[in-house]
Amino acid sequence: MGEETDKEKPSPRREGGAVRHRLPSLASLLARAVAGQRLPSVISGQVGRFPESVLDDAAITLTEADILGTARPRLATQVSNSRALGARALRELAVSENADLDPRLQLALANRRSGMRGFATASTEADEVSVIAHVRTLKAWREHPDVMAGAQLGKAKGRGFLVTGRIPIDRVEALAAETDILDLRAAQPVHPTLGASVEQTGADPASFPEGFDPQGGDGVVIGVVDYGCDFAHRNFMRADGSSRLESIWDQLGIASIDSPMGYGRRYSAAQIDAALSASDPYDALGYGPEPDSPLRTGTHGTHVMDIAGGNGTGSGQAGIAPEATLIFVDIAASDISRMGPGVVNQHFGDSVQLLEAVRYIFDEAGDRPCVVNLSLGTNGGPHDGSSLVEQGIDALVEGDSNRAIVIAAGNSHGDGTHTSGRVTASGSLDIGWDHPGEWGGEFELWYDGDRRLEVELIAPDGTRFGPVRPGSSLPLGDHEVIIFIASIVGNRTNGDNAIGIWVAENVMEGEWTVRLTNMTSQGTDFHAWIERDDYAQSYFTQPVESHTLGSISTSRKAIVVGAFDGHKASLPVYTYSSTGPTRDGREKPEVSAPGQNVFAARSRTTGGVTRKSGTSMAAPAVSGLIALLYADAARRGQDLSIDELRDELIRRARRDPPKGGKSTWHPRRGFGRAHI
């Protein structure tokens, strides 16, 4: 058996109030690079993961720069690599941007106008960008000549609809200006974030309350959006050897004429069953999980799916809902190139393909109750439930009964990736932002829409960039964008203001300063977050440990799950389990579940298990519980809206210590430990 923590970054420790991280060794970075690459079949045994034009390119050479992560991909919504120019060598680029646009779209345009050409990704061509849009009418979006329409997510709050799609970068401004398009947002990166699980959640049939008969979740669909599905593990097979998986959508697979949303490859139950009869099922199907590596003992998705719905046929230990039907979406890393140096620091996926994955699962489920597990997240965003991604999540579950989305709270407690404070009237305030090893980073700050903050970025050597006034942006570099600062006034989704800063690798190691100057006569409160980086996390020198939930974990209608250690008598909170509330003060997470040292199915085995920790392991335990609740309700002829389901989960939760039925909320435990 192997073991792996869901937090694959070095553990931070406090030194003088700051968070310190040990940089990865060269050997570990090489191992990550090799493990992270989705290689052609002639190299890794993987089949059907690359377009045919790439399959002939068998020899891939990793330079030292690639291994060290100093040569990240040049993609539309990322800053370029600075080639160790240093801060003083940067100058303002003569490119004009529309300051009303989403900052990521502004960056895409700045990159395009400075001559950078993006890579093609799983669902976009070169110089296209994935977007989430708020539109007046579906017809206008679907028939627009510049749009490759994706998924319809549902009705938006107030008016219109939420949709996804792909558009050319050079048409972004024109589309954003059209009256039928109310808002346009670029894709945002997201990352992956049993014995004790069954016992602590009360999912053992012997302990069910009288009259509760979920029949193992029979008749309910559990969908998992993650990476890596070991469909040949016996925990996902019936007694007759057939698969419990109704389908797999591999978003990175070679597209066919019937590909969902126009990309990737769908594998049906019949195709999976045929592959299971072969000596090498993964080769026969043309899909399989990544091989094990010194740093990853088993794929994330296989482990997550087993916790929610494995039947124990192979391992001897069933998950929470062993009779449920399973659907898996292997999400594509759409914010990175699928070859070359980008593999060193690849993202898990993106928010557009995430929403399309959930839409696909609900469509496949049809009239059956369905819960979708998302053990992933991101730090950027308003953290108030207003982002188009979160509105999309809400729309997907509000339209029908018996639909739920469960999201891991995140593992950011103690990382130093959140801070907050107040800039006094007409005063200034400095935020320390430490960059280890010249790795760069991404910073996002939100404050009230009736206030105005000017921002200046100061490098460790004292070089100043800015100031940037509200409603303007500043691209800096040497022909290409190396630093990008954007200040948005009146965000369309919530009316608040936002400041975004992107710093490329190799600019300068050390403590950067973000200087805020209040342009109003009233004190201005703010919250700021740093985007997650699993290899060398930048951090605030004076972090605030509240409000560390992942940004999609602040959705209004998703069920958000924290983690505790189910092996210890005191059931302590998992060390890294993120902390609520949301920026607008709502109480999340809803519940917590076992997430530390959880044993479940191991990749590339038919019956093995491995140990992992994190809120990624807690979320599927709750997904399995929801499947049981849905199955019992269906047996009694009842439907559950998402609000009724949330109330039922909170009502059944175990308080620790017991509060006599009082619904006391804890910023990390939620309303209690999830239980039948």
Describe each region flagged by the PLM.
Residues 2-213, 218-221, 240-241, 335, ...:
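Autoinhibitory N-terminal propeptides
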Residues 116-121, 340, 365, 369-375, ...:
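C-terminal subdomain of the subtilisin-like protease fold in secreted/lumenal serine endopeptidases
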Residues 187, 331, 356-384, 408-409, ...:
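Short acidic, glycine-rich surface-loop motifs adjacent to enzyme active sites
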Residues 209-350, 367-370, 381, 385, ...:
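Subtilisin-like serine protease catalytic core
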Residues 249-250, 260-277, 402, 415-508, ...:
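Extracellular S/T/G-rich loop segment that most often corresponds to the catalytic His/Ser-adjacent loop
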Residues 305-308, 314, 327-335, 362-370, ...:
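Hydrolase catalytic cores
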Residues 371, 389-420, 424, 673-675:
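Catalytic cores of secreted or luminal carbohydrate-active enzymes
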Residues 521-533:
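Edge beta-strands of jelly-roll/beta-sandwich modules across compartments, strongly enriched
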